Amino acid sequence: MLAALYYVLKGDPYKALKEDLESLKKAKLLTEDLRITEKGMELIQQLISKPISLKGKVVSGDGEGRYYLSLEGYRRQVREKLGFDPFPGTLNVLLDPTSTEKKSTLMFKRPIILKGFTENGKRYGEVLAFPARVSGVEAALVIPLKTHHPPEIIELISPVELRKALKLKDGDEVEVLVY
């Protein structure tokens, strides 16, 4: 994938795609007619079933998570779909470069969808949620479909205030296991 990105940046996306596809064929993950092989399916199944480890540093947010998690439309769905009553706030983590890249493998996992809703005439969007653990504490990684955060920032919700429960401060390193 990095090779493909390199070629795209050099201005030849067709060559990049062709080389990427050729490497997948050589690894016997794709057939000549671009179907996923049994070996390719096994690899995808492994990606889906294994937890993804993301590492980064705790950073302060702007308080928006507190606002959104005070809305009953989201709270109710978290209780129903994730099985916990969320603390009204998120823990923001600035991922290291390797973890930022690894975050894209979440597309192989099936998200829990918190549906959008309207409250007091205002529309709130969908949020993708993935069960997770932070230092052994139950949590969920949440990805709002509309966000101002850059890709290297993730937000975590939990039944407890993660900062307090884990004695975290800005700059502390954490590992998040996403299931």
Curated annotation (Swiss-Prot):
Q: Which UniProt keywords apply?
A: Flavoprotein, FMN, Kinase, Magnesium, Metal-binding, Nucleotide-binding, Transferase
Q: Which reaction does it catalyse?
A: riboflavin + CTP = CDP + FMN + H(+)
One BP term from GO: riboflavin biosynthetic process
* List of residues binding Mg(2+): T90, N92
The pathway where this protein functions is: Cofactor biosynthesis; FMN biosynthesis; FMN from riboflavin (CTP route): step 1/1
Q: Out of the domains of life, which is the source? A: Archaea
The record's annotation in Pfam families points to: CTP-dep_RFKase
What does the UniProt record say this protein does?
Catalyzes the CTP-dependent phosphorylation of riboflavin (vitamin B2) to form flavin mononucleotide (FMN).
* The name this protein goes by in its record: Riboflavin kinase
Q: Which organism encodes this protein?
A: Ignicoccus hospitalis (strain KIN4/I / DSM 18386 / JCM 14125)
Q: Which gene encodes it?
A: ribK
